[in-house]
């Protein structure tokens, strides 16, 4: 019986790989976070609004730079309408080229949610995730051709829970950053971000991660 079992294993090629558990994923994130300083990628975003049962989609490119917990990010949306989004410190800007208008928002204390909402998993250590979230493994799935472990994160902070119900991350079996994120709000809305053509720690100047605006742009501050 033992020889038959061995023969069957050899014929199949090898024993199946052990399942990627939470500790494995968090260890990879710890390792990557130690040297992480930025990433570029193609981005597709799906936004679901529960009250009207509506989905909207956008796609473009993203440049993200992290220094400690400081995030500088630029997103260039091409489809369906061109626009640019920039986030730096506690400020967010949205530029509409067809109107030559930039809207500037003061994120204030909500600026900390950028790390929780937009940049989670990019340079985040596994230790930080465990500190701020209850982390569970939800199985393995393939995203953009990459076998990935899906993690579910529930915020431990009551204040964060007011804004974010939970976050799902798809982490490739050979990487420490997500190829997909899904952020759920308490009311049933969600945001799905999927990434491709990712380049880790690109050799780019800091200016590449900042919003580029024409000198004659019209500024608006909707909060005032």
Q: Which residues does each PLM region occupy?
A:
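Hydrophobic h-region of N-terminal signal peptides that target proteins for export
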Residues: 8-19
